[in-house]
């Protein structure tokens, strides 16, 4: 996750096909394809920040809620990200330290979840101010089993594409 943070801090965009729920919870923007695989896939099922997607009824939404419940987190993703992790990391970017909160300074280290949240908040703030093309636009994608899908993938963000096997994730990404 720290490597992703460094790439994003350098101005890169990340588009990742992923099923790991910790990674999904940490992303800025989530795109779920489905609803199933093969001929029953290839459509846009859900998209948005993970804290918004988790409120739906898709496979990923249900999995996120069940995972958070199993972890004992009965609060939305962003609030859960503020909870302290069981280990500490050093903040390598002094500009992010004020966004982490009063209990976590760069000198004493910050929880990984707090660092992820601070970086996500900073990226969202910068993207809101950025002029020009803020998204990679995919229009009427119909390769393999994609069914005329149009989607915007935010630039400079940590984007995750997820969905069941055969739903069109790799086709969309490539």
Regions found by a protein language model. Give the residues of each.
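Conserved phosphate-binding elements of NTP-dependent enzyme cores
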Residues: 1-174
């Amino acid at each position: 996750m720290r490597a992703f943070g460094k790439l994003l801090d350098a101005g890169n965009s990340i588009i990742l096909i992923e099923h790991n729920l910790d990674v999904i919870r940490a992303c800025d923007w989530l795109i779920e394809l489905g609803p199933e695989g093969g001929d029953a896939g290839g459509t846009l099922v859900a998209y948005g920040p993970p804290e918004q997607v988790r409120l739906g009824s898709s496979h990923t939404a249900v999995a996120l809620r069940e995972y958070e419940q199993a972890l004992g987190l009965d609060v939305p993703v962003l609030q859960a990200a503020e909870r302290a992790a069981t280990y500490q990391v050093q903040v390598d970017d002094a500009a992010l330290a004020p966004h982490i909160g009063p209990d976590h300074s760069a000198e004493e280290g910050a929880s990984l979840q707090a660092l992820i949240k601070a970086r996500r908040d900073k990226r969202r703030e910068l993207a809101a101010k950025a002029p020009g093309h803020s998204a990679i636009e995919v229009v009427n994608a119909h390769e393999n089993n994609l069914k005329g899908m149009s989607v915007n993938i935010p630039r400079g963000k940590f984007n995750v594409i997820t969905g069941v096997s055969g739903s069109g994730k790799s086709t969309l990404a490539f």
